[in-house]
């Protein structure tokens, strides 16, 4: 399946640069690709919860949203959580922050934007790189053209700056 192919290529790029990452994964993808999930963890990367089904939380009841996150975490087993679309209601944030560390980002590649060229995607990232920055890339079909171009060049720039890619730690 597509997600499997993209993650495998991302893992190969990260390995080439001896880089570690935190993958915020969907529970439904962990169910669909358990071997790939295990490969991510076995390679020394960290995983975080990105809900089970990538629902838009602001359109769901608090109870249903929490159920979706907790159902995903039965598969993912992580204390890290990132809401889809970076949108979460105050009530959802309060409830989830009691059990999870909510993690956003410093640099969004916007690799998912079909109107964005691969070069512009790279520029979005490299102009904001700094030590400790959390940079977001995606592993979807929609983002693959830009990610495939920008991620290895970003990893190369990080290396040239004397920085290192690490997982998010609590």
Where are the predicted features?
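Active-site beta-loop-alpha junctions enriched in small/polar residues
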Residues: 26-28, 52, 83-86, 107-110, ...
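CE4/NodB-like, metal-dependent polysaccharide N-deacetylase domain
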Residues: 12-22, 45-46, 52, 62-90, ...
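Distinct, well-ordered alpha-helical segments
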Residues: 10-11, 33-38, 91-96
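Short, surface-exposed acidic-centric catalytic microdomains
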Residues: 31-51, 57
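His/Asp/Glu-enriched short active-site or ligand-binding loop at hydrolase and phosphoryl-transfer sites
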Residues: 87-128, 162-170
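C-terminal domain-boundary segment and adjacent tail
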Residues: 16-18, 29-32, 145-170
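Short, small-residue-biased leader/transition segments that mark boundaries at the very start
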Residues: 1-6
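A short acidic, helix-capping loop that chelates divalent metal ions and anchors anionic groups
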Residues: 51-60, 111-113
């Amino acid at each position: 399946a597509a997600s499997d192919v993209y993650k495998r290529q991302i893992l190969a790029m990260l390995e080439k640069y001896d880089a570690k990452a935190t993958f915020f994964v969907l529970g439904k993808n962990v169910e669909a690709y358990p071997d790939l999930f295990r490969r991510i963890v076995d390679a020394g990367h960290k995983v975080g919860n990105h809900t089970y089904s990538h629902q838009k939380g602001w359109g769901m009841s608090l109870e249903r949203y929490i159920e979706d996150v907790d159902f995903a975490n039965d598969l993912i087993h992580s204390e890290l959580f990132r809401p889809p679309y970076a949108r979460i209601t105050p009530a959802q944030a309060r409830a989830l922050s009691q059990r999870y560390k909510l993690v956003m980002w410093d640099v969004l590649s916007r690799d998912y934007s079909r109107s964005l060229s691969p070069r512009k995607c790279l520029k979005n990232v490299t102009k904001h790189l700094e030590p400790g920055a959390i940079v977001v890339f995606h592993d979807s079909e929609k983002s693959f053209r830009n990610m495939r171009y920008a991620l290895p060049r970003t990893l190369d720039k990080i290396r040239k700056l004397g920085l290192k890619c690490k997982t998010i730690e609590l």
